[in-house]
């Protein structure tokens, strides 16, 4: 199903009626975990150590046109080729749509040099220990308060995230809640290290004394053992909102939905949708739709910026499987489309930013 050029819809498409031409607000939740330091598990940084800077640098780039916590702009490097951070996609789309951008600290080890809402200040641990997140229910409850407040200021809330190694922690939560997500979460690299992710998750579950599905009635235990702090923060924002919420992200957002379903088995997803990029939706190494359909009737909106037509070589790396999504890129592009901006104009603006701020 396609209603706008560059947009594919998986699901009923009914959600769009409530968010088209509405005042919107975009908030990005930033978080880090020690899991991202495991070699080979993520490409969201030039080295495992630098992944801790990626979320802060991403939102600083959107606000200030340049990172302040790092001398260089975050990028994913595979075989010598650098793919620009998805923050440039988010920045371009939000500028064109004239949508306000906010930041929430869900647990970032490096705090961004921008004004932000403090939901949680403690980063996540290494999920292999089985002790990943401190007080996840408290994080969720603070997210609820943020969702209630922000939804009183707008007609449509879009929530993105920047959490290196977030697909691994998503796999952990999905598995603990009983979902079949093995070999289905995406990755920021062309090679998806499924075996490593599963090994890391199983080590965490073992050390926490948890079997697959054990946490279906104890959802916060799943996050505490093998999750990340972004997941309960964003679940809280979404469940606290009184207006439609677009979860802007890839397979990490299915873990958010799974947590919401476990907290409230009767949760109605008709006012909640996932928006992502074509690079996630058509990734042969993952399956966001198969995960989502296990959880509920969740519309997924997929934006294709047609980077094959881009002249900037770094953007071609997205076509080769690098990056795919992040910082709410898919949701930001959806916002631009909903505000009547053609996808070609979004791509052109992305290229302009790549040629100026990434030069």
Curated annotation (Swiss-Prot):
Similarity comment: family membership: Belongs to the UPF0284 family.
Domain of life: Archaea
The protein's name in its UniProt record: UPF0284 protein MTH_1426
HAMAP family per the UniProt record, alphabetical: UPF0284
UniProt-recorded Gene Ontology molecular function terms: nicotinate-nucleotide-dimethylbenzimidazole phosphoribosyltransferase activity
Organism: Methanothermobacter thermautotrophicus (strain ATCC 29096 / DSM 1053 / JCM 10044 / NBRC 100330 / Delta H)
InterPro entries, alphabetized: Nict_dMeBzImd_PRibTrfase, Nict_dMeBzImd_PRibTrfase_arc, Nict_dMeBzImd_PRibTrfase_sf
UniProt-listed NCBIfam families: nicotinate mononucleotide-dependent phosphoribosyltransferase CobT, PRK04447.1-5
């Amino acid at each position: 199903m396609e209603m706008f050029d560059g947009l594919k819809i998986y699901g009923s498409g009914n959600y769009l009626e409530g968010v088209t031409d509405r005042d919107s607000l975009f908030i990005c939740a930033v978080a880090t975990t020690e899991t991202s330091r495991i070699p080979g598990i993520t490409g969201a940084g030039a080295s495992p150590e630098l992944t801790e800077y990626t979320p802060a640098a991403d939102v600083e780039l959107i606000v200030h046109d340049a990172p302040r916590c790092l001398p260089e702009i975050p990028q994913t490097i595979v075989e010598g080729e650098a793919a620009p951070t998805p923050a440039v996609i988010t920045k371009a789309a939000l500028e064109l749509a004239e949508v306000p951008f906010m930041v929430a600290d869900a647990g970032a080890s490096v705090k961004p040099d921008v004004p932000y809402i403090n939901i949680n200040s403690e980063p996540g641990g290494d999920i292999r220990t089985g002790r990943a997140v401190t007080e996840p229910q408290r994080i969720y409850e603070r997210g609820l308060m943020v969702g209630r407040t922000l939804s009183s200021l707008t007609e449509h809330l879009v929530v993105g995230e920047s959490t290196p190694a977030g697909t691994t922690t998503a796999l952990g939560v999905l598995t603990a809640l009983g979902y079949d997500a093995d070999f289905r979460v995406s990755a920021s690299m062309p090679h998806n290290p499924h075996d490593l992710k599963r090994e890391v998750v199983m080590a965490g579950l073992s050390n926490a004394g948890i079997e697959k599905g054990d946490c279906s009635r104890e959802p916060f235990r799943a996050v505490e053992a093998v999750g990340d702090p972004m997941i309960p923060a964003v679940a809280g924002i979404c469940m606290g909102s009184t207006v439609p919420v677009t979860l802007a992200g890839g397979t990490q957002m299915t873990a958010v939905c799974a947590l919401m379903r476990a907290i409230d088995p009767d949760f109605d997803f008709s006012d909640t949708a996932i928006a992502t990029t074509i690079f996630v939706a058509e990734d042969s190494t993952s399956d966001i739709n198969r995960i989502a359909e296990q959880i509920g009737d969740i519309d997924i909106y997929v934006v294709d910026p047609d980077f094959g037509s881009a002249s900037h070589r770094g953007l071609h790396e997205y076509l080769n499987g690098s990056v795919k999504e992040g910082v709410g890129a898919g949701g930001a592009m959806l916002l631009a489309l909903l505000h009547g901006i053609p996808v070609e104009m979004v791509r052109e603006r992305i290229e302009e930013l790549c040629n100026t701020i990434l030069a």
